[in-house]
């Protein structure tokens, strides 16, 4: 859900994480795969470029939730073996064919993943038209090359046997959620759906905001405490039977003493430039409308003069619009999350 449009002025802020919340035997997974999980957790710490926004609230300083989400995703890309947007298709993990994925990131055993898709499309009890399934869901060129190379080795076993995949795999699905509080229900639904598709999910990681971080994003975003309560409810009623780690993302500075003066100055300057350009464009439109009306009743000589004036105004309007679009793109106009 979105509210008033805001510009997001780029600044760098320090972030950290609080102690992760481990649900449904997630502690066992953490102890077994501590090195990998710590690598992921450590990637969430440090200074990140985010978008500063001004808000009409008690605490006027804020940051764009979208910019924070993008910064986290970009940092996670540096972890070996991690995948970005991920869908669960017939129990396998695949990148979305188009648009956003069901999950923000994943780490999974690539060979075992191919085994599962092979069994579904070409195994002993495979679905009919397995080739069509593959063509529909494996669109990424690099992934298709790996799949085709894998299939060459298995071609003689089509519809004769299922593949014996490794049992010592460790698969992670994860979500970074700084959206409206109601998104936690959608996220849980996606997890339950993936479980029902027989995906091998060894750990689900959910990154949400602490109360401190919510103060500079919005009180309406998914918070750690609410996420913990909702996930625990669904674990208790057996909708979710996978280990869940909730990671509290926090700011690493004192809100009451942090100096935002440079960010405020830059934000005000850009806001003023955008407002001035919008006013010029609005004035151009009104002036063009007035001149068009005048031209209708003018004699031919006067009409030519008016036509040239309109042409100049349109060129000026076009130039101003281009400049405005460039500014908005550079400073990433973002949606501010509405308070609930």
Which residue ranges define each predicted feature?
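Conserved binding-pocket/active-site segment within a compact domain
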Residues: 156-245
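Internal, charge-rich low-complexity segments
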Residues: 108-141, 255-291
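Generic structural hydrophobic/aromatic packing signal, biased to beta-strands
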Residues: 40, 68, 72, 76, ...
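Nuclease-adjacent, charged terminal/linker segments that flank catalytic cores
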Residues: 1-97, 268, 272-340
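Active-site metal-binding core of divalent-cation-utilizing nuclease and nuclease-like domains
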Residues: 58-60, 75-168, 180-189, 196
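Domain-level recognition of nuclease-like catalytic cores that cleave nucleotide substrates
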Residues: 210-286, 319, 330-340
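A diffuse structural propensity rather than consistent per-protein peaks
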Residues: 64, 101, 223-224
